[in-house]
Amino acid sequence: MKKKEIVDDVTMKRAITRITYEIIERNKNLDKIVLAGIKTRGVYIAQRIQERLKQLENLDVPLIELDTKAYRDDVKSEQDTSLIPIEIDGTDVILVDDVLYTGRTIRAAIDNIVSHGRPARVGLAVLVDRGHRELPIRADYVGKNIPTSQSEEIEVLVTEVDGKDSVNIIDPN
């Protein structure tokens, strides 16, 4: 099993900053935005985008945490640990996740969101898009496009959980 770092902490910070600038440029009503971090690492990436929006635009963007397990079609869990303390009707929800792969997690996140309200719009921001979609889902904001083979894995590490920021590609062969 080979593991190779393909994004270091500096490059990750730049990618998150670029995503933040794209969110600012493409959204006319920044005050209607709600960031929805997909547990676990998507929440930490969403928090960093939230911090950058505060620094750049002096904007307090609400952040909610989504647990997709109860909404997945491949792994079932009865317990939904989502934290959605605000009304999302009429808002522009931007889902935030670490890696976009098949699209199944995003579909589950959308199901979770619409079970709690009716946003005006749902967008998607991901740190890494690795391809291999099984569903017709495309990210609106992408930090890095990293084409992979089906057998390879992408591992995102964040300081808050793993003690460091990096993205690794793991080749099991």
From Swiss-Prot:
| Reaction equation(s) it catalyzes | UMP + diphosphate = 5-phospho-alpha-D-ribose 1-diphosphate + uracil
Cysteines joined through disulfide linkages: none
GO molecular function terms listed in the Swiss-Prot or TrEMBL record: RNA binding; uracil phosphoribosyltransferase activity
A GO BP annotation = DNA-templated transcription termination
The EC category is transferase
Superkingdom = Bacteria
Enzyme Commission designation: 2.4.2.9
Q: Which Pfam families match?
A: Pribosyltran (PF00156)
* Keyword vocabulary terms for this entry: Glycosyltransferase, RNA-binding, Transcription, Transcription regulation, Transcription termination, Transferase
Family designation: Belongs to the purine/pyrimidine phosphoribosyltransferase family. PyrR subfamily.
How does this protein assemble? Answer: Homodimer and homohexamer; in equilibrium.
Q: What does this protein do?
A: Regulates transcriptional attenuation of the pyrimidine nucleotide (pyr) operon by binding in a uridine-dependent manner to specific sites on pyr mRNA. This disrupts an antiterminator hairpin in the RNA and favors formation of a downstream transcription terminator, leading to a reduced expression of downstream genes. Also displays a weak uracil phosphoribosyltransferase activity which is not physiologically significant.
PANTHER family linked to this entry:
BIFUNCTIONAL PROTEIN PYRR (PTHR11608:SF0)
The protein's name is: Bifunctional protein PyrR
Q: Which gene encodes it?
A: pyrR
